[in-house]
């Protein structure tokens, strides 16, 4: 359903106190009977910001952004007063050229651990920045006695710019690229029963939509089995987790329920793994 259609259905069923679960929508009107299963973008952003604040070893923070993400860069600057802002180079007409130079970043780095936020939806820019950062990560200066600059890359908004053909996953792994996500990737070595059954039936491993459909359906069924209804299950089963997704519903003061649980993950040896906190 589109958000408009979903809101219409939820509105019509609200008078019957019938719960309505949204599998993928985030910008919904939370009627009292609505369960928004997909975490909001704000929750994902908060997860990354809290991760940055919790790491006491971080000695320097850099925010790299393009013009479209100036508001996000300024928000991060308010969260981290020490943060240095680096923006895309611009043309004579003032338009983003979606690149930075080695010198742009090198001057902002410090010895020790540096956390670098990259905020963009442009794949070429993401490719340029990650390449430059990878070349500077733990670079040893034979003429200096200072420790090298360790770079950890993060973003508050994971999107297709970080997943395209121009992106070098080796660079992302070397930079320990961290981001928040609604779902983690299942480990094929875990011998998961659902994955095995799906593969046997369709001769292919399930994609994210298939896994999410299973996780969400299983969650609703188990909540109904273990509680009188979905509403009471929020207290009886405050956190549930399945193949790739977890659900921890909270109720808005005036409105329905939203999923308050997300994963923090990172690239490690060319795979995406959960960061245990």
Specify the residue positions occupied by each region the protein language model found:
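Extracytoplasmic ligand/sensor domains, especially the bilobed periplasmic-binding protein
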Residues: 3-62, 68-76
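A short, well-structured beta->alpha microelement
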Residues: 83-110
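Solvent-exposed loop/turn segments at secondary-structure junctions
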Residues: 2-6, 25-29, 67-71, 122-125, ...
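Extracellular/periplasmic periplasmic-binding protein-like sensory domains
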Residues: 130-212
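Glycine-rich, charge-decorated loop segments at or immediately adjacent to ligand/cofactor-binding or catalytic sites
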Residues: 30-35, 98-102, 160-173
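Periplasmic-binding protein-like
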Residues: 1-2, 21-23, 60-66, 111-129, ...
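Segments of small-molecule ligand-sensing domains
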Residues: 203-210, 221-276
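Sec-exported extracytoplasmic/periplasmic mature domains
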Residues: 14-18, 53-57, 81, 134, ...
């Amino acid at each position: 359903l589109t958000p408009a259609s979903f809101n219409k259905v939820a509105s019509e069923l609200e008078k019957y106190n019938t719960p309505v679960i949204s599998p993928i929508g985030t910008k919904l009107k939370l009627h009292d009977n609505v369960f928004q299963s997909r975490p909001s973008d704000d929750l994902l952003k908060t997860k990354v910001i809290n991760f940055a604040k919790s790491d006491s070893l971080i000695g320097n923070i850099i925010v790299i952004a393009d013009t479209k993400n100036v508001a996000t860069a300024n928000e991060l600057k308010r969260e981290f007063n020490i943060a240095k802002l680096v923006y895309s180079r611009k043309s004579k007409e003032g338009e983003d050229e979606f690149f930075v130079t080695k010198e742009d970043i090198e001057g902002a780095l410090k010895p020790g651990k540096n956390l670098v936020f990259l905020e963009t939806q442009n794949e070429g820019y993401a490719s340029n920045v990650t390449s430059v950062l990878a070349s500077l990560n733990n670079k040893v200066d034979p003429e200096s006695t200072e420790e090298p600059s360790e770079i950890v890359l993060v973003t508050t908004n994971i999107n297709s710019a970080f997943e395209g053909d121009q992106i070098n996953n080796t660079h992302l792994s070397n930079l320990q690229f961290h981001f928040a996500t609604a779902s983690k990737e299942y480990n094929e070595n875990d011998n998961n029963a659902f994955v095995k059954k799906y593969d046997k039936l369709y001769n292919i491993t399930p994609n994210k939509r298939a896994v999410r459909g299973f996780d969400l359906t299983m969650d609703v069924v188990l909540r109904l089995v273990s509680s009188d209804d979905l509403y009471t299950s929020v207290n009886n089963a405050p956190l549930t987790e399945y193949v790739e997704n977890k659900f921890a519903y909270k109720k808005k003061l005036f409105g329905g329920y939203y999923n308050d649980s997300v994963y923090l993950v990172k690239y490690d040896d060319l795979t995406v793994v959960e960061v245990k906190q």
